[in-house]
Amino acid sequence: MHSTNVRESCFNMSIHIKLQIPRDHFILDVDFTIPNRGITALFGPSGSGKTTILRAIAGLERAKQGEIVVGEQTWQSKAIFVPAHRRAVGYVFQNASLLPHLTVRENLTYALKRKHYSEDKVSMAQVIEWFGLSKLLARQPQGLSGGEQQRVALARALLIQPQLVLMDEPLSSLDQKSKQEILPYLTQLHENSSTPMIYVSHDWHEIRQLADTVVVLEAGRIQRQTTVAEYPASVTYCPHCQQAIDHFV
């Protein structure tokens, strides 16, 4: 894909994921398409296959059978497997995984060196503003709070100019105060970024605040895919998910 078409492709592409991966107690077997912008949440109890799906999309795990198509690019099929380093994915893990010997500014600059397109969809100045990083740029990761580290990790994921951002429970390691501090930044990211995102969580409060679409998983199967606004009124598909929602509603 040529850099001159990056902005246009973000609005026109579809993202289709079809996977079959054996797990210890079930076979992950999913087939779904996500919107070409906004946040799609993978929601379900621990061990339902959410992180496995992200790893397969990122190329960190190869599905026994599968098809992953992002826009006009096939990342996996019977005949094709694009390695992880060639997939235009920004990945945010549960822990920030920043480079400890670099400052915040240097971590962000390093991401720019790894970007997938010569034309920028988002600039350094934009992510610094979105995530409130201006006062942190000269600091080392070990001097940051958990929430601050995740803000840097989110900014870094965007600066590689990905086609897709994957977030694997990015708030799960934070205390409640840190979660509440970072949620407004995630909301701003949602409002400002045109890059589609997949957000993994078993916390309905986070999903209700951040996501547009929810894919409900249980034991490796999709129980439901709908908008977040419509989902709570029709929860009959996942008992564990209903318990999670009842806790917050």
Model-derived regions: residue spans:
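Conserved ABC ATPase "signature" region
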Residues: Q73, S77, E119-L136, T187-Q188
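Conserved H-loop
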Residues: S194-V200
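A short, proline-enriched helix->beta-strand linker immediately N-terminal to the Walker B motif
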Residues: L159-Q163
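ABC ATPase NBD coupling module
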Residues: W75-G90, R114
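Catalytic Walker B motif of ABC-type/P-loop ATPase nucleotide-binding domains
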Residues: V165-E169
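Conserved ABC ATPase signature
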Residues: Q140-L144, E148-Q150
